[in-house]
């Protein structure tokens, strides 16, 4: 988590025997540099936004790492493809640490099979394709985001947009026009509250239309979820509700949303 302090980061680096760390910027680099001598396994730090102006053999910008990678592939026969093919499904894919809010962070070992079985199960029930656009804003240290908004997108070759920060999510929805957003219930509660608050100052007729459309939508969705075909009258109402209400709500959410995926806790 980017909010972790140096002592917490140092514990995780020591506990995981980390050899290489990628950090976002100079601020995160400064937290880790002080731990270099106390983490015997740590060999390299890579700064992703190329903001390090004092590179060393052990601390380098991402652009420098790319250059070293090109040089390595030219001088070595071990190809990236062969390295991938050598991986076993029981090999460790990642260690995900708890946030540490209630004590010392605990590392959870996840294998390739652990995560890929979840991805495969997701793709069996969700009609995702390579044209999807994910908007990601949960930390990648959060297992829900890692699985739902990261590995799943990789598996289908989709595009991932990363929100600037939680306060900018509403703006980023309009800028990126995502088809899928993975989040925790709190975000959806905020969106719901914002719409309901807006209705309080809306004309009476608009409020009536909104709640009528909401009722139609619930009936229509329940039919679909139970593999039943909505009748002609309900379908007509749904089409009218879409034109009058749904389309306007969708537009405020970027206009292309197909799925909001919620996890981490039950929706109320």
Regions found by a protein language model. Name each.
Residues 26-41, 188-204, 243-255, 267:
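Adenylate-forming
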Residues 1-68:
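Structural core segment of the AMP-binding/adenylate-forming
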Residues 4-34, 118-135, 166-180, 252:
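Conserved ATP-dependent adenylate/AMP-binding module captured primarily in the ANL superfamily
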Residues 63, 93-119:
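Conserved AMP-binding A3 loop
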Residues 116-133, 140-243, 256:
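Conserved AMP-binding/adenylation subdomain of ANL enzymes
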Residues 47, 66-97, 104, 127-133:
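Conserved pre-ATP/AMP-binding loop-to-beta segment of ANL
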Residues 1-2, 138-142, 264-266:
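Conserved AMP-binding
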Residues 10, 81-84, 170, 246:
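Short hydrophobic/charged patches on amphipathic alpha-helices used for structural packing
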């Amino acid at each position: 988590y980017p909010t972790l302090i140096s002592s917490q980061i140092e514990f995780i680096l020591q506990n995981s025997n980390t050899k290489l760390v990628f950090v976002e910027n100079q601020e995160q680099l400064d937290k880790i540099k002080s731990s270099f001598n106390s983490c015997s396994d740590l060999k390299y730090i890579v700064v992703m936004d190329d903001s390090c102006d004092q590179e060393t053999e052990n601390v380098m910008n991402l652009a420098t790492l790319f250059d070293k990678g090109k040089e390595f592939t030219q001088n070595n026969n071990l190809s990236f493809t062969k390295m991938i093919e050598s991986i076993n499904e029981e090999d460790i894919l990642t260690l995900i640490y708890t946030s540490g809010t209630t004590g010392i962070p605990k590392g959870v070992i996840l294998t390739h099979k652990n995560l890929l079985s979840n991805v495969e199960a997701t793709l069996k029930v969700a009609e995702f394709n390579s044209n999807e656009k994910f908007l990601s804003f949960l930390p990648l240290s959060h297992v829900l985001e890692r699985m739902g908004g990261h590995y799943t997108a990789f598996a289908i070759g989709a595009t991932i947009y990363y929100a600037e920060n939680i306060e900018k999510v509403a703006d980023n929805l309009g800028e990126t026009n995502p088809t899928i957003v993975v989040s925790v219930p709190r975000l959806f509660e905020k969106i719901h509250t914002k719409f309901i608050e807006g209705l309080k100052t809306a004309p009476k007729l608009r409020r009536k239309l909104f709640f009528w459309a909401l009722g139609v939508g619930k009936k229509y969705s329940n039919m679909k979820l139970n593999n039943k075909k909505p009748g002609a009258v309900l379908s007509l109402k749904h089409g009218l509700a879409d034109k009058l209400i749904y389309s306007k709500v969708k537009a405020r959410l970027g206009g292309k949303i197909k799925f909001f995926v919620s996890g981490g806790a039950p929706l109320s």
